[in-house]
Amino acid sequence: KLKPVGISFHVGSQQKSLESWEKAINISSRVYKNFLKKGILMNFLNIGGGFPTYYSKYKTDIKKYSQQILESINKNFGEHKPRNIISEPGRFLVADAGIIEAEIILITQKTFKKARKWVYIDVGRYNGLAETEGEAIKYEIKASNDNKKYKYESFILAGPSCDSHDIKKKKN
């Protein structure tokens, strides 16, 4: 016989909407209270999904996030909240822990009208940059030789494969 010990949810990676957390906490509290009515006390609430992190312009105010999530837990669970509340900060803690170094392997200029320059690098969707698909995560891109004498140009950044999903940046 299985004995439930807790409730866990995942609001989605890089979730910036506090309303999504509020909704998940509200649903969890209703499930928790239904079990409580049946005499089953669960000791854990795992609020998963990870707190959003800084990739380009968005910066998480972790104090605001934590405070609003805690207020939501207190409001929805009241006096009957689980003894242990587990958070999964995820990439909020580790996103800045690494750097990907890539080399340009090809630069092309298409010949048809209104064509843009394409820059291909040796890292792509299938070897390190899967989460950039659809520009969901916009990594900061810097040249290792950031010399001011070079002019800045607009281009499409793509990985090394022929897969149409291996495009890193279209809007630059």
Could you describe each region identified by the protein language model?
Residues 1-108:
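Active-site loop/helix belt of alpha/beta enzymes
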Residues 68, 80-172:
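Charged (often Lys/Glu-rich) extended helix/loop segments that serve as interaction or gating elements
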